[in-house]
């Protein structure tokens, strides 16, 4: 129930990271924040709604109440028991859309986190990380990207269905310092919903057993034994089924792995994420990617979502 109307003129911001989900076998459970960020700045006003988007998606996303950041801000305000008569929402987007890099999770987590910047100015209690993960995952339907965007770094997430409503949970992992991260981003786009249609409704016991073993090994590889990353990123549940819809990414994935680079689809693709103990990709692999339309970006693990009250509104 709304108990407080925010005054006009309050400003808050959030910076939120991109993320890569699955990392091979960790389907809908393992996520990794990446050092590519969107920034959201929101101001309360006396009435109305204005949405301004710069960068990725500026000509493609809705500019009204359907905008994902707007929906997340309003859901966050509802969760903390406050309201705003009007909003100006400014988004500076660097995370590519529909590429498997968690742009929707970043929008939701950023919108929710902005609310913390508002409640800090009225001496109210901000949303905890657990609440941010829960609310963001309710938008997403799974917690892997949302949890990574909230907590930063690598995470293991799960859904507790012992309650009337799903309880989305996550714990952070300490990513091994010897692991280097590379994203290979194509021009091609793919929506998660479209990609999920390609997945079978049932899998064999052998395939399930294979992925369970690799997902368990992946936690060890990410934290203690990066020399095991090649075996730990093997998957038979989702990537083979998605390959037909993104042939260029599938071919580049095979080439990277032939060069002993632990590459996987990033989320539902078509971007790839590569994890390596080497500081650079093999020359042939890097040249192939560049020649075939992939933008290759060396990254680090992204930070947890950062929110701030009372920032200067950009002109």
UniProtKB/Swiss-Prot annotation:
The keyword NAD does not apply. GO terms for cellular component: cytoplasm. ATP binds at residues 96-106. Keywords: Amino-acid biosynthesis, ATP-binding, Cytoplasm, Kinase, Nucleotide-binding, Threonine biosynthesis, Transferase. Pathway: Amino-acid biosynthesis; L-threonine biosynthesis; L-threonine from L-aspartate: step 4/5. Pfam families: GHMP_kinases_C, GHMP_kinases_N. It is an enzyme of class 2 (transferase). Its EC number is 2.7.1.39. GO terms for molecular function: ATP binding; homoserine kinase activity. It is found in: Cytoplasm. It comes from the Bacteria. GO terms for biological process: threonine biosynthetic process. The keyword Hydrolase does not apply. It catalyses: L-homoserine + ATP = O-phospho-L-homoserine + ADP + H(+). Catalyzes the ATP-dependent phosphorylation of L-homoserine to L-homoserine phosphate. HAMAP family: Homoser_kinase. Belongs to the GHMP kinase family. Homoserine kinase subfamily. This is Homoserine kinase. It comes from Mycobacterium leprae (strain TN).
């Amino acid at each position: 129930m709304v108990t407080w109307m925010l005054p006009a003129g309050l400003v808050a911001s959030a910076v939120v990271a991109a993320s890569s989900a699955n990392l091979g076998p960790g389907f809908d459970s393992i996520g990794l924040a990446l050092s590519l960020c969107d920034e959201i700045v929101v101001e309360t006003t006396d009435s109305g709604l204005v949405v301004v988007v710069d960068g990725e998606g500026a000509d493609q996303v809705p500019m009204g109440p359907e905008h994902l950041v707007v929906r997340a801000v309003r859901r966050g305000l509802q969760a903390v028991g406050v309201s705003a008569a009007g909003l100006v929402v400014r988004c500076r987007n660097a995370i590519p859309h529909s590429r498997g890099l968690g742009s929707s999770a970043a929008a939701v987590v950023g919108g929710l986190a902005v609310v913390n910047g508002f409640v800090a100015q009225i001496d109210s209690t901000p949303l905890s990380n657990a609440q941010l993960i829960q609310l963001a995952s309710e938008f997403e339907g799974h917690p892997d990207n949302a949890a990574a965007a909230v907590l930063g770094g690598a995470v293991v997430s799960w859904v507790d269905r012992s309650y009337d409503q799903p309880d989305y949970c996550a714990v952070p992992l300490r990513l091994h310092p010897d692991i280097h991260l590379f994203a290979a981003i194509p021009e091609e786009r793919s929506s998660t919903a479209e990609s999920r249609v390609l997945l079978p409704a049932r899998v064999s016991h052998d395939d399930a057993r294979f992925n369970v073993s690799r997902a368990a090994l992946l936690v060890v590889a990410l934290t203690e034994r990066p020399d095991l990353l090649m075996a730990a990123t093997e998957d038979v549940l989702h990537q083979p089924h998605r390959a037909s819809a993104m042939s260029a990414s599938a071919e580049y994935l095979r080439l990277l792995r032939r060069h002993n680079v632990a590459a996987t689809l990033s989320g539902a693709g078509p971007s790839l994420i590569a994890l390596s103990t080497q500081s650079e990709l093999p020359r042939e692999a890097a040249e192939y990617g560049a020649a075939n339309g992939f933008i290759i970006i060396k990254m680090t693990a992204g930070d947890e979502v950062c929110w701030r009250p009372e920032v200067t509104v950009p002109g």
